[in-house]
Amino acid sequence: MKFQARVLTLYPEMFPGFLGCSLAGQALKQGIWSLETVQIRDFALDKHHSVDDTPAGGGAGMVMRADVLAAALDSCPNDSPRLLMSPRGRLLNQAYARSLARSSGVTLVCGRFEGVDERIIEARELEEVSIGDYILSGGETAALVLLDAIVRLLPGVMGNEISAKCESFENGLLEHPQYTRPAVFEGRGIPPVLTSGHHKAIANWRQQQAESLTRQRRPDLYALYNKNRQKT
């Protein structure tokens, strides 16, 4: 079944962007997933094609109108998760990307200006999603990141399923260090265990490295990893 991505945006020319390259681009050409953009401005209600207005109660900037967004959303089938890219939303992680990859598709709403009228979130039951604790110019960049995280997990996109399962976050840990030729680079060699041919020793080394890196760099992840490990 083809994964269908639909993006509501004021800048459809930003898509597919980098998703037209590499693995995601190949999968798009092969029909593993599809991408449709919806120009929000097409659903404006006045001759000026206005999509925003001043915030109620005063304040800086402009707010995207609920009625315009509702018309744009209602023009699309309601057959997949409806997500609003928002810095106050649920933080994207690998587990969430994997759960979305199991669905039939996603409909993404890209905000601009100071955000969107809260009533559209309530009325159309949009789930807010964030890619990190920082502010972007609009939701389009975040939508591209989210789609990249999803698409690479779709069946048939990645050539090596084992590789995907060994990546950072898949088992709750950061990925272990990787090495390849040349054997020596500027005086630095490859850890001997990796060229020993002893598969169990290599697996143990990689696990130890992953745990050590996670403990040093992401103590929050390491605490969760230990908690989950104690349950099993």
Curated annotation (Swiss-Prot):
Localisation: Cytoplasm
Molecular function GO labels: tRNA (guanine(37)-N1)-methyltransferase activity
EC id: 2.1.1.228
GO CC aspect terms: cytosol
Keywords: Cytoplasm, Methyltransferase, S-adenosyl-L-methionine, Transferase, tRNA processing
Xref: CDD domains: TrmD-like
SUPFAM superfamilies to which the protein is assigned, alphabetical: alpha/beta knot (SSF75217)
Family annotation (Pfam families): tRNA_m1G_MT (PF01746)
Annotated GO biological process: tRNA N1-guanine methylation
InterPro entries: Alpha/beta_knot_MTases (IPR029028), tRNA_m1G_MeTrfase_C_sf (IPR023148), tRNA_m1G_MeTrfase_TrmD (IPR002649), tRNA_m1G_MTases_N (IPR029026), tRNA_MeTrfase_TRMD/TRM10 (IPR016009)
Binding site for S-adenosyl-L-methionine: G111, I131, G132, D133, Y134, I135, L136
Catalytic activity: guanosine(37) in tRNA + S-adenosyl-L-methionine = N(1)-methylguanosine(37) in tRNA + S-adenosyl-L-homocysteine + H(+)
Top-level taxonomic group: Bacteria
Keyword Cytoplasm: yes
Family: Belongs to the RNA methyltransferase TrmD family.
Primary role: Specifically methylates guanosine-37 in various tRNAs.
Complex and partners: Homodimer.
NCBIfam families: PRK00026.1, trmD
Protein name: tRNA (guanine-N(1)-)-methyltransferase
Organism annotation: Bartonella henselae (strain ATCC 49882 / DSM 28221 / CCUG 30454 / Houston 1)
